[in-house]
């Protein structure tokens, strides 16, 4: 049963609802009155539903697409101002025990040279990134016993402690595997900016095909991670 407020993956992600939403959007891609109504709601910052968002994505009316783009810019500037915030990825380790079919880091890739950065190497990388002008990083690591939460936390401390040319990294975002409530608490206490977790698909059947083995193959555990965080 579809329940957007549920913390159970099988309830807040419903394949039937997703398919119906896509069909509804395609059926209304030329519905000018409906699309204008949705854009009016968006401009008033009243929020739109997932079905309404899908209709905007499918919109096939050029003039309304132009209105949509202009509105998106205005809303962005209203909320964030006239700026774009960028961050640089910092890969700590490509050791991984998962079998993601789209990723060269997958565990069965025996031709890849595996590497985990030492704290000294991390410090060197941070200095190089600062010299390029970066003040925000996204910490990346494969899922592997070597890349324990202790290693991640130590790496975060190292990054924040690098003082270079009277500057330092202001924000460390973290992109690591789905983990426990306790570990998310530790990340928050370490002062991270944003926790990032990619969900390649919400279709369970396709998810299992893309993730045939390893901890990430657990669809529910991965999909429910943001509720734990």
In which residue ranges do the predicted regions lie?
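Core AdoMet radical
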Residues: 107-123, 128-229
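Short, well-ordered coil loops that connect the C-terminus of an alpha-helix to the N-terminus
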Residues: 44, 81-82, 98, 165, ...
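Flexible, acidic/Gly-rich N-terminal and inter-domain linker regions that tether
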Residues: 1-90
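Canonical Radical SAM [4Fe-4S] cluster-binding loop centered on the CxxxCxxC motif
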Residues: 81, 85-121
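Generic, ordered loop/turn and secondary-structure boundary motif
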Residues: 49, 76, 85, 91-97, ...
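Generic detection of intrinsically disordered/low-complexity segments and helix-coil linkers/edges
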Residues: 6, 18, 96-99, 201
């Amino acid at each position: 049963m579809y329940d957007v407020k549920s913390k159970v993956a099988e309830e807040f992600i419903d394949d039937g609802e997703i398919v119906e939403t896509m069909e509804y959007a395609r059926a209304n891609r030329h519905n000018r009155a409906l699309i204008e109504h949705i854009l009016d709601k968006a401009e008033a910052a009243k929020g739109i539903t997932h079905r309404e968002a899908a209709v905007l994505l499918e919109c096939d009316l050029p003039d309304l697409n132009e209105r949509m783009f202009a509105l998106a810019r205005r809303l962005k500037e209203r909320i964030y101002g006239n700026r774009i915030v960028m961050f640089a990825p910092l890969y700590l380790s490509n050791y991984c025990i998962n079998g993601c079919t789209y990723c060269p880091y997958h565990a069965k890739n025996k031709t890849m040279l595996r590497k985990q950065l030492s704290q000294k190497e991390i410090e060197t990388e941070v200095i190089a990134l600062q010299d390029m002008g970066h003040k925000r990083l996204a910490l990346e690591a494969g899922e592997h016993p070597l890349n324990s939460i202790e290693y991640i936390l130590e790496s975060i401390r190292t990054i924040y402690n690098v003082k270079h040319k009277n500057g330092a990294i202001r924000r460390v975002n973290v992109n690591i595997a789905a983990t426990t409530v306790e570990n998310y608490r530790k990340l928050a206490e370490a002062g991270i900016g944003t926790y990032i977790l990619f969900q390649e698909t919400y279709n369970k059947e396709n998810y299992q095909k893309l993730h045939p083995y390893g901890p990430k193959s657990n669809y529910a555990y991965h999909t429910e991670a943001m509720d734990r965080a």
